[in-house]
From Swiss-Prot:
Antifungal protein. May bind to beta-glucans and have beta-1,3-D-glucanase activity. Belongs to the thaumatin family. This is Osmotin-like protein PR-5x. The gene is PR-5x. PANTHER family: OS03G0233200 PROTEIN (PTHR31048). Its main location: secreted. Disulfide bonds join 34-229, 76-86, 91-97, 145-217, 150-200, 158-168, 172-181, 182-187. Keywords: Disulfide bond, Glycosidase, Hydrolase, Pathogenesis-related protein, Plant defense, Secreted, Signal, Vacuole.
Length: 230
C-alpha cells in the first residue's frame, strides 16, 4: 500500500509539473504606452483586453502555440456584451477575438517551441500599420534573440493610395494580385513594401521578407514583451 501511494504521489507530481510546463511555456506581457486607449487582441489564445494608458495584460502561451498574433485595435466601442466595432484591427465586431483582425494593423507574430527547440517571432506590416510597436524577449540571449521595433511615423508618411482612417493599409488589401499578395509562388518587394521596409527594417514588409525579419529565441526559457507606442 505504501509503495502504491508513493507511486501515485510521484505520478501526480510529474503530471502537475508537466501541466505547469505546458501552461507556462512563455509569458507575453502586452503594455500600452500610447496616450490613448488600445484594445489589445490576441489569437489563438487570449482573445482581447481594453488597455488604457499604462495598463498591462499578461498572456500565458502554451508550448507549441503557432500562427499566433497580437495586435492593437483603435477607436473601438463595445457594449456590455462585448460587441461593437473598431476603426482599425476589428475582429468581427467582438471584444474577445477568435479570428484575425481587419487590416490595417501592426502585428506581433510568434510560434513557440518549433524546429530545433526555438521560438520564432516577428513584427509584420504585411497587414499594414496602425500603432507603433516593439516586440522583445525579456531575457535576450544574443544572436537573433533581441528586441525589434517599428516606431516610425508611418501613418503620417503613408502613400496616398494606402491611406485609410486610423492607419496605413497594405498593398495586397488595396490592390490585390500576385505582385502584392504573393499567393501563387515566389514574389519580390514592391515600391510599397520598400516604403515600409525603409522605415521599419526589422519588420516584414511583404509575405516573403523572411531573411531580415524573422527572429528566434530558445524555447522554454524566454518570455516576451509587446509594447504599443514605446
Amino acid at each position: 500500500m505504501y509503495t502504491n501511494m508513493g507511486y501515485l504521489t510521484s505520478s501526480f507530481i510529474f503530471f502537475f509539473l508537466a501541466l505547469v510546463t505546458y501552461t507556462y511555456a512563455a509569458t507575453i506581457e502586452v503594455r500600452n504606452n500610447c496616450p490613448y486607449t488600445v484594445w489589445a487582441a490576441s489569437t489563438p489564445i487570449g482573445g482581447g483586453r481594453r488597455l488604457d494608458r499604462g495598463q498591462t495584460w499578461v498572456i500565458n502561451a502554451p508550448r507549441g502555440t503557432k500562427m499566433a498574433r497580437i495586435w492593437g485595435r483603435t477607436n473601438c466601442n463595445f457594449n456590455g456584451a462585448g460587441r461593437g466595432s473598431c476603426q482599425t484591427g476589428d475582429c468581427g465586431g467582438v471584444l474577445h477575438c477568435t479570428g484575425w483582425g481587419k487590416p490595417p494593423n501592426t502585428l506581433a507574430e510568434y510560434a513557440l517551441d518549433q524546429f530545433s527547440n526555438l521560438d520564432f517571432w516577428d513584427i509584420s506590416l504585411v497587414d499594414g500599420f496602425n500603432i507603433p510597436m516593439t516586440f522583445a524577449p525579456t531575457n535576450p540571449s544574443g544572436g537573433k534573440c533581441h528586441a525589434i521595433h517599428c516606431t516610425a511615423n508611418i501613418n503620417g508618411e503613408c502613400p496616398s493610395p494606402l491611406r485609410v482612417p486610423g492607419g496605413c493599409n497594405n498593398p495586397c488589401t488595396t490592390f490585390g494580385g500576385q505582385q502584392y499578395c504573393c499567393t501563387q509562388g515566389p514574389c519580390g518587394p514592391t515600391k510599397f513594401s520598400r516604403f515600409f521596409k525603409q522605415r521599419c527594417p526589422n519588420a516584414y514588409s511583404y509575405p516573403q521578407d523572411d531573411p531580415t525579419s524573422l527572429f528566434t529565441c530558445p524555447s522554454g526559457s524566454t518570455n516576451y514583451r509587446v509594447v504599443f507606442c514605446p
